[in-house]
């Protein structure tokens, strides 16, 4: 799934669309996305100018966007908005820098009454950069 297809599913846009493409998807069960981290990312201007590091919260947001794509492909949730309700067991294990390619893998644990629970792992190569358990609610509006 290319970026133009992602934009048909997610409401996010530059500079907050953090998924470049989806390389694997099982509707409602799993999705794997790619984020190519470039030196031109706007957050590197301040985080940190002489030592650019991708903010961990944006890695978690990228995982959430991949989870959203897995769920928003289900007919029942097409056109809905996913809003965070919780983040648990979040750990940052590797610094992510310009030039890195983040592989964002999300497994959907459950979907009940629009409440989605998922587990995400972000990797650079074979190294885990971040892990988190994500919860969000599918809604008509914010």
UniProtKB/Swiss-Prot annotation:
Q: Tell me which UniProt keywords the record has, alphabetically.
A: Cytoplasm, Lipid A biosynthesis, Lipid biosynthesis, Lipid metabolism, Lyase
For this protein, what reaction is catalysed? a (3R)-hydroxyacyl-[ACP] = a (2E)-enoyl-[ACP] + H2O
User: What job does the chain carry out?
Assistant: Involved in unsaturated fatty acids biosynthesis. Catalyzes the dehydration of short chain beta-hydroxyacyl-ACPs and long chain saturated and unsaturated beta-hydroxyacyl-ACPs.
Q: Which GO terms describe its cellular component?
A: cytoplasm; membrane
Q: Which HAMAP family match?
A: FabZ (MF_00406)
CDD domains assigned to the protein according to its UniProt record, in alphabetical order: FabZ
| Record-stated family | Belongs to the thioester dehydratase family. FabZ subfamily.
Q: What is its EC number?
A: 4.2.1.59
GO MF entry, a single one = (3R)-hydroxyacyl-[acyl-carrier-protein] dehydratase activity
Q: Where in the cell is it found?
A: Cytoplasm
User: Matching SUPFAM superfamilies, A to Z?
Assistant: Thioesterase/thiol ester dehydrase-isomerase
The active site is formed by: 47
Q: What is this protein called?
A: 3-hydroxyacyl-[acyl-carrier-protein] dehydratase FabZ
PANTHER family per the UniProt record, alphabetical? 3-HYDROXYACYL-[ACYL-CARRIER-PROTEIN] DEHYDRATASE (PTHR30272:SF1)
Question: In its UniProt record, which GO terms are filed under biological process?
Answer: fatty acid biosynthetic process; lipid A biosynthetic process
